[in-house]
Swiss-Prot record:
GO terms for cellular component: neuron projection; plasma membrane; SNARE complex; synaptic vesicle membrane. SUPFAM superfamilies: SNARE fusion complex. Residues 117-118 are vesicular. GO terms for molecular function: SNAP receptor activity; syntaxin binding. This is Vesicle-associated membrane protein 1. Keywords: Coiled coil, Cytoplasmic vesicle, Membrane, Phosphoprotein, Synapse, Synaptosome, Transmembrane, Transmembrane helix. The modification Phosphoserine is found at S63. It comes from Bos taurus. GO terms for biological process: SNARE complex assembly; vesicle fusion. The keyword Hydrolase does not apply. The chain crosses the membrane at residues 97-116. InterPro entries: Synaptobrevin-like, Synaptobrevin/VAMP, V_SNARE_CC. Residues 1-96 are cytoplasmic. Residues 1-36 are annotated as: Disordered.
Length: 118
């Protein structure tokens, strides 16, 4: 049988196995990954802050729009009631005018009948 395989020995600390150029020490790699992760977290936090600001701004605009819609609804209701009152007023004026016109026509007919048949 052959001799058991031994793991390659590293010449210097942080040297790559197989005799290649030495890689960064494991502590540096984890620091770099930690920094990248922190940068990503900061980026996400910034994006979330912007999103929260936009949501608050949108909420304020919606609140203002709701207030304006309520005011418009109140104005429309007031307009509707005043228009109904005005319509009724002019309907009665029109009725009075028709009654007066009918009375004048009746008087003219009576005068003509009396004039010709008397």
């Amino acid at each position: 049988m052959s001799a058991p395989a031994q793991p390659p020995t590293e010449g210097a600390e942080g040297a790559a196995p197989g005799g290649g150029p030495p890689g960064p020490p494991p502590n540096m790699t984890s620091n770099r990954r930690l920094q990248q992760t922190q940068a990503q977290v900061e980026e996400v936090v910034d994006i979330m802050r912007v999103n929260v600001d936009k949501v608050l701004e949108r909420d304020q605009k919606l609140s203002e729009l709701d207030d304006r819609a309520d005011a418009l609804q109140a104005g429309a209701s007031q307009f509707e009631s005043s228009a109904a009152k005005l319509k009724r007023k002019y309907w009665w004026k029109n009725c009075k005018m028709m009654i007066m016109l009918g009375a004048i026509c009746a008087i003219i007919v009576v005068v003509i009948v009396i004039y010709f048949f008397a």
